[in-house]
């Protein structure tokens, strides 16, 4: 299987990420034109974490984002269903756990905050994954979802679509260890709901106070929410 399909068979998606793990971080930086670093900083700021907080970084990949979150003084654990991705980040000194977002291997109310960046699209059942995130978060705890979204300017949206479907696959062939995986990336972004649509899914999973903020013209959106009190 060279790339996953949009039916998101978990084993196919995990295998696809295993195949891109070796050059994943470099490829992300190149294909995002360096914006990935900015998106990670904004995600950390939106979480508002600090010493004493317990944080789950879901779909953490090689744990680059987890290390940056841990710089806040919070205790952070990286979780991903791709063992290859976690292995590629083995030199990063944070706890790592392999697990499925729809069946997280953590007890109820284990975390003060949960975040998932560019991974919710790959979960076979988005609402079930969001419900699991709520289960492992304490009442009053925070969720931040950083995900590709819909550009707000029509002309920019047209250019972005051209980049996704034409330029990105060509660039991936030059730098990625599995270029076909980035065709799946482009297709999954096109099929993803817009900002309001994702907000509705988050609310449907039981989160409250859902709001979002656009980054890079809406290419990415940060959705934040709170787990309601009991």
Curated annotation (Swiss-Prot):
Query: Which pathway is this protein assigned to?
Result: Quinol/quinone metabolism; menaquinone biosynthesis; menaquinol from 1,4-dihydroxy-2-naphthoate: step 2/2
Catalytic activity annotated for this protein? a 2-demethylmenaquinol + S-adenosyl-L-methionine = a menaquinol + S-adenosyl-L-homocysteine + H(+)
What are the protein's GO molecular function terms?
demethylmenaquinone methyltransferase activity
Tell me the Gene3D superfamilies matching this sequence: Vaccinia Virus protein VP39 (3.40.50.150)
Q: Out of the domains of life, which is the source?
A: Bacteria
Tell me one Pfam family matched here. Answer: Ubie_methyltran
Q: Name one GO biological process term.
A: methylation
Q: Which residues form a coiled coil?
A: none
Say which enzyme class the record assigns.
transferase
Tell me which residues bind S-adenosyl-L-methionine: 62, 80, 100-101, 117
Q: Which keywords appear in this protein's UniProt record, sorted alphabetically?
A: Menaquinone biosynthesis, Methyltransferase, S-adenosyl-L-methionine, Transferase
Enzyme Commission number(s): 2.1.1.163
Q: HAMAP family attached here?
A: MenG_UbiE_methyltr
| Record function comment | Methyltransferase required for the conversion of demethylmenaquinol (DMKH2) to menaquinol (MKH2).
Q: Family, per the entry?
A: Belongs to the class I-like SAM-binding methyltransferase superfamily. MenG/UbiE family.
Protein's recorded name: Demethylmenaquinone methyltransferase
């Amino acid at each position: 299987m060279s790339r996953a399909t949009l039916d998101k068979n978990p084993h196919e998606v995990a295998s696809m990420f295993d195949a891109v793990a070796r050059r994943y971080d470099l490829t992300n930086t190149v294909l995002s034109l360096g914006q990935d670093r900015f998106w990670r900083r904004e995600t950390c700021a939106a979480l508002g974490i600090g010493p004493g907080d317990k944080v789950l970084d879901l779909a953490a990949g090689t744990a680059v984002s987890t290390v940056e979150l841990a710089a806040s003084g919070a205790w952070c654990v990286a979780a991903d269903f791709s063992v290859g991705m976690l292995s590629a980040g083995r030199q990063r000194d944070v706890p790592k756990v392999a697990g499925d977002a729809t069946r997280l291997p953590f007890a109820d109310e284990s975390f003060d905050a949960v975040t998932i960046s560019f991974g919710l699209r790959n979960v076979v059942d988005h609402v079930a994954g969001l419900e699991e995130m709520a289960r492992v978060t304490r009442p009053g705890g925070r969720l931040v979802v950083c995900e590709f979204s819909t550009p707000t300017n029509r002309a920019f949206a047209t250019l972005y679509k051209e980049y996704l479907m034409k330029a990105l696959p060509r660039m991936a062939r030059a730098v990625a260890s599995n270029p076909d995986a980035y065709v799946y990336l482009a297709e999954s972004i096109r099929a993803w709901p817009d900002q309001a649509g994702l907000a509705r899914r988050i609310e449907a999973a039981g989160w409250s106070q859902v709001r979002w903020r656009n980054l890079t013209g809406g290419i990415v959106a940060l959705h934040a929410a709170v787990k309601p009190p009991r």
